[in-house]
Amino acid sequence: KELLDADGDILLNGGXYYIV
């Protein structure tokens, strides 16, 4: 599942952090 952070970053359940 992909969750959007308040900053708009996508947090992956795999533990990876992707900044969009």
Swiss-Prot record:
Family annotation (PROSITE patterns): SOYBEAN_KUNITZ
UniProt superkingdom: Eukaryota
Alphabetized GO MF terms: serine-type endopeptidase inhibitor activity
Entries under InterPro entries matching the protein: Prot_inh_Kunz-lg
Keyword Disulfide bond: yes
Keywords, ordered alphabetically: Disulfide bond, Protease inhibitor, Serine protease inhibitor
Oligomeric form and interacting partners: Heterodimer of an 'A' and a 'B' chain linked by a disulfide bond.
Family: Belongs to the protease inhibitor I3 (leguminous Kunitz-type inhibitor) family.
Biological role stated in the UniProt entry: Inhibits trypsin and alpha-chymotrypsin.
Name of protein: Trypsin inhibitor A chain
